[in-house]
């Protein structure tokens, strides 16, 4: 399995509200772990957005291509740098409805356009369709770091300090997500009534 470089993880899972110079693009990455209920070895991999295919759609296509045994249950855990956009939320819900032998859990480092109504609706749709969406905390960042990152090369930073900082930053994002899950709740001091049609 291909692994992320430590620097890619450090940059792309960075959940600070504002970036410092030099600026860099925050890409959409999805790391997944598929664990059979029978205790077999988990399958892992990752995807990033392509020009005409979001990482979530690449993930769905990959799982479909595996020809999984539908008489067996599987736990699927996904770690994303950005929460799914509204379009991908619908695709994920349809996918899980058609594959009820899969239990999917989504953990995101950051919330994608969280102030926009379509994205809020997408997150609520997922949570209401037995696809829990949560913000990554220390356990999820640590698990992602351990299982999806190449640790062979020397590091230019302290990984434990990085994980602690990610966990600290995630607390405000978790509160934001909890407000989104409840329609009509005030967010950032104002009603979340901004219309936004932006998509990547």
Swiss-Prot record:
APOBEC3H activity is regulated by RNA. While RNA-binding inhibits the DNA deaminase activity, double-stranded RNA is required for HIV-1 restriction by promoting APOBEC3H homodimerization and packaging into retroviral nucleocapsids. (Microbial infection) Antiviral activity is inhibited to some extent by the HIV-1 virion infectivity factor (VIF), that prevents its incorporation into progeny virions by both inhibiting its translation and/or by inducing its ubiquitination and subsequent degradation by the 26S proteasome. It catalyses: a 2'-deoxycytidine in single-stranded DNA + H2O + H(+) = a 2'-deoxyuridine in single-stranded DNA + NH4(+). Residues 4-126 form the CMP/dCMP-type deaminase domain. CDD domains: cytidine_deaminase. It is found in: Cytoplasm; Nucleus; Cytoplasm, P-body. The active site is at residue 56. Its EC number is 3.5.4.38. Changing residue 70 to R: Partial resistance to ubiquitination and degradation by an ECS complex hijacked by HIV-1 Vif. Changing residue 21 to E: Decreased DNA deaminase activity. Keywords: Antiviral defense, Coiled coil, Cytoplasm, Hydrolase, Immunity, Innate immunity, Metal-binding, Nucleus, Ubl conjugation, Zinc. Changing residue 18 to E: Increased DNA deaminase activity. Changing residue 113 to A: Decreased DNA deaminase activity. (Microbial infection) Following infection by some HIV-1 strains, such as isolate BRU/LAI, can be ubiquitinated by a cullin-5-RING E3 ubiquitin-protein ligase complex (ECS complex) hijacked by the HIV-1 Vif protein, leading to its degradation. Ubiquitination by the ECS complex is however less efficent compared to APOBEC3G or APOBEC3G. Expressed in lymphoid organs. Also detected in non-lymphoid tissues including lung, testis, ovary, fetal liver and skin. Changing residue 173 to A/E: Increased DNA deaminase activity. Its cofactor is Zn(2+). InterPro entries: APOBEC/CMP_deaminase_Zn-bd (IPR016192), APOBEC3H (IPR041512), APOBEC_Cyt_Deaminase (IPR050610), CMP_dCMP_dom (IPR002125), Cytidine_deaminase-like (IPR016193). One of its GO terms (cellular component) is cytosol. APOBEC3H from old world monkeys has retained its antiviral activity, while it is lost in other primates. It is one of seven related genes or pseudogenes found in a cluster, thought to result from gene duplication, on chromosome 22. DNA deaminase (cytidine deaminase) which acts as an inhibitor of retrovirus replication and retrotransposon mobility via deaminase-dependent and -independent mechanisms. The A3H-var/haplotype 2 exhibits antiviral activity against vif-deficient HIV-1. After the penetration of retroviral nucleocapsids into target cells of infection and the initiation of reverse transcription, it can induce the conversion of cytosine to uracil in the minus-sense single-strand viral DNA, leading to G-to-A hypermutations in the subsequent plus-strand viral DNA. Belongs to the cytidine and deoxycytidylate deaminase family. Homodimer. Interacts with AGO1, AGO2 and AGO3. This is DNA dC->dU-editing enzyme APOBEC-3H. It comes from Homo sapiens.
